[in-house]
């Protein structure tokens, strides 16, 4: 069924909550393990209609944040979502109280029971009103960001549409693009500062109600992190600071030499090559045709997947006024259909987001068709889910010539370099958020000062050259995740560590790398991050010294593939 044929009906929340109570009672009373397993499948399916409606509403809202009907529907889910989540938690609580609960681990793997425990520990009826307030705060941020229109080159442009100007070979054009963006954020400075303060206050209040010191502690439960905690993440960040950042300084020196920009400033960083960055082929149809060929040749599984996605028009990837920034993949369970949202802006990032979101969607497509996988275990934890997407970016490399033509080698270098450099920025975002939630009384200026300190730690090569907004340390405010889903961002770093290993493996044996990836994908959400890495034969980055060798291999490859 094509996307525009999918019908939306606002769900009956009362009926759903009553059904949840019934399922919780059944779970508590299940007489044996077989009955409990059957009931787990039943409760997992019970939310399919609600989740389909919620995701349809969110797709339509983010595609046009100005549409009053879909804004009202999004408000409905913002208001009612916490009650539904809490009802789901009560079902988990009932499963955990059943003496046969260990059967679920035997059937569904280590994440099932551990995930239910996290769900119980992460939710509380006393926080429902605070959760509703948080959802409203996020919607306000999305409206500020999604409604951004700036004047440049005689045009009204969205933030994503500034992308090509930021990569222009004329430094004055680049500076003007960044200043136009900065002007918009500076104009909303007071509101953005106030919003973030309210978000920190809100989430810390939720944490304290539930007995946690602050939200940085609660987040590990809410993010369903299984098998590791704050100490492992701190060790990971330390390894990046000590073993990756020094290598990145070499990489940035190579970039400066390659571009001929002797003393690059922040607005020069998007320039990767003297003659301009790689450009993908133009045109929606041409790109989609290339994607179909690419996925048909990659594997039978991806061929079936891309046909389903394109034939059912499950993409909205072109930027336009009123459309929310960013990119995502979501699922429509009633139709067993993934959906991909993006904002193409005629830069190489268009291919990044296409292959990235297709990685998410491919895993969802495979899991939805495996009858052994319950609906709520189709996707693993977020740090693992990002492996599917980031690794797909690299594993499609043999076909990138279809999308870049003569710029293919430039894109290969840019993509590998950007992914490697990203590790530092991702750790910076994570450490910043830990500081913010552990020090909630910081003033807006003090928050910005902390960000600038972390810039020196993780990205010491950056010179902001008195650029408005960024130069005062407020650049973090354009990072959607910091407002919308705190503490998510480190997941991109953990998955990047897996993706870089897939990249290095593919250089010597692409077929083997793909088969390892498929094994990982087929475990769906029924294995933890460390188990998934072990399934694919990859190193776990929490172990001391595990990153150093990978960082050296990446630097060596980048040094020998300068274009």
How would you describe each model-predicted region?
Residues 342-368, 389-390, 394, 432, ...:
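Active-site recognition of the HExxH zinc-binding catalytic motif
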Residues 122-123, 179-188, 228-234, 269-280, ...:
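Glycine- and acidic
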Residues 242-243, 367-368, 379-407, 415-416, ...:
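Post-HExxH zinc-binding segment in Zn-dependent metallohydrolases
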Residues 274-334, 347-348:
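Auxiliary, metal-adjacent structural segments of Zn-dependent hydrolase domains
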Residues 115-117, 227, 318, 354, ...:
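C-terminal, non-catalytic "cap/extension" segments appended to globular domains
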Residues 1-278:
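A well-structured
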Residues 196-213, 251-255, 359-369, 390-407:
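Long, well-ordered alpha-helical segments
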Residues 230-231, 254, 258, 298-301, ...:
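Inter-helical turn/loop segments and adjacent helix faces that build the functional surface
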